């Protein structure tokens, strides 16, 4: 496989709108909150748990099957969740939630483009990677 790293993306904290003025919790404090995660096997779930530095799944979590579901659960006051920054405008557009960036330890993930070395579209994938890297630089 060929991999080209494109950019790093932060996860943002999604809380009920009534929590907008509360301090942003750190990763340890997050484990004491009602954490809403995607179901077992999803990479965002494992990335969130990794940020919280937990070795086993906390008992106080609830699961959803999609980011939209998690955001709606937050909007209903059920708990808090983390979602990728790139998904925030779409997923939170009509939800009554507050969006916060973490202040110190910032959860993030690497985004890249991966393809088989034998793929006949090698040149096009490289061009797409350059475009995506440049697009990300202009959007910051």
Can you describe what each PLM-predicted range is?
Residues 2-5, 21, 26-28, 89, ...:
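Short secondary-structure boundary/capping segments
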